[in-house]
Amino acid sequence: PYQQLVGSLDQLASLEDASFDVILCHNVLEYVEDRKVILREFTRLLKPGGLLSIVKHNEVGRVLQTVVFENDPQKALDLLAGQDLETHSMGLAQAYDLGAAVEDLALEVQDYQGIRVFYALQDNHFKGQEGWRESMLQMELAVCQESPYRDIAFFQHYRLKRS
């Protein structure tokens, strides 16, 4: 059965060890300060062989989108210098290295794919045209598993396995 949990670390701490086959955490860890603690809890909660699905901002994709779509080289330079990204709806997003965040945990990256490889670079003028979404989806799906495309995407989707 599917169970959606919305809450805090306290709620996670109240759950039994190895009680989940799959945990989804999409576009969350950029907005919390204690991501290492959260990842440790996810590891505890996953059954051996369980999967953790993480979607996160990709710093390379953020810089590309800022230069190409927003036409704001100074903001892109600030991002390159380590400044956090102010998002439209979620607030301050802090970049992080997923490999470093899980290096001492019983989690291993199995695979990753790019999300919004080209979408985030397109002018909004085109996005309302008939057939645009279908064509863009076809293009995104054609490259989402392939480097270098997945490495420049705005978001990346990681699949990690609990050992």
Tell me the role of every PLM-derived stretch.
Residues 21-35:
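A short SAM/SAH-binding and catalytic strip from SAM-dependent methyltransferases
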Residues 13-23:
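A short acidic, Gly/Pro-enriched loop at the edge of an enzyme's catalytic core
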Residues 3-5, 110-113:
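General small-molecule cofactor/ligand-binding pocket signal
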Residues 88-106, 112:
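Short alpha-helix
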Residues 51-79:
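Conserved class I S-adenosyl-L-methionine
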Residues 1-14:
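Conserved SAM-binding strand-loop segment of SAM-dependent methyltransferases
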Residues 111-163:
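A C-terminal cap/extension of S-adenosyl-L-methionine-dependent methyltransferases
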Residues 36-51:
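A short glycine-rich, Lys/Arg-flanked "PGG" loop and its adjoining helix->strand segment in the class I
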